[in-house]
Amino acid sequence: PRTSSAASDVYKRQTKYYSGHSDVMGGSLAVNKKVFNKVKAAEKITGLRLGPDDAYLITRGLRTLDVRLDRHRENAKKIAEFLSKNKKIKLLYPYKKNSHNFRMWKKYYSGASGLMGLKIKAKNEKSVIKFVNNLKLFGHGYSWGGFESLALHQNTREQGNRSFFKLAKNEHLVRLHIGLEDPSDLIADIKQSLKHLK
């Protein structure tokens, strides 16, 4: 969610965890009456309304949100524990005590999501791409928040010279979204694919 500096407005995307299947477009606003009246007037002029199918799918997804988030969190925790033992990988995930965000995360949040970053030490980018491409249970993409596990190599999201994270020499970023599959299957899949890293 995005909160304004005055903390009177909250904007939430409903395209991700809310529906749980990466198949809707939507968002929600929690605003004061003054802002609400402006938004309502703009909505009438532009015709931007949530479609009935999207509204139905989001409502249906909300019924299982807590159960799904528990599973995402537990699966991600197990995978984070497995990956943190690998010397080639620096885990970007607030659950780990050595994470630079751990204290803030602990103060403000009761759990983590299924999204994590891996800073991978490798001599060449090709082996990192091979690692991602050889994952059998992970789809490729960045529609985080759905039921399925996804993997994305950093460079496929760079635009021009802009980089989303500062990486050291021989470091490559892979982002993982951990889905609802059996965590032991996901760990086995990651383990077999890690053999491609050089």
Feature locations, PLM:
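Single conserved hydrophobic/aromatic residue that forms the stacking wall/gate
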Residues: 1-7, 11
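Small/polar loops that bind or transfer phosphate-bearing groups
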Residues: 2, 31, 178
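Short, solvent-exposed coil/turn segments
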Residues: 4, 24, 111, 169-171
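Structural preference for beta-strand elements that scaffold enzyme active sites
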Residues: 9, 90, 115, 173-175
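Hydrophobic aliphatic residue packing
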Residues: 10-11, 24, 178
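Active-site C-terminal subdomain of aminotransferase-like
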Residues: 14-115, 119-156
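PLP-dependent enzyme catalytic core of the Aspartate aminotransferase-like
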Residues: 122-126, 149-198
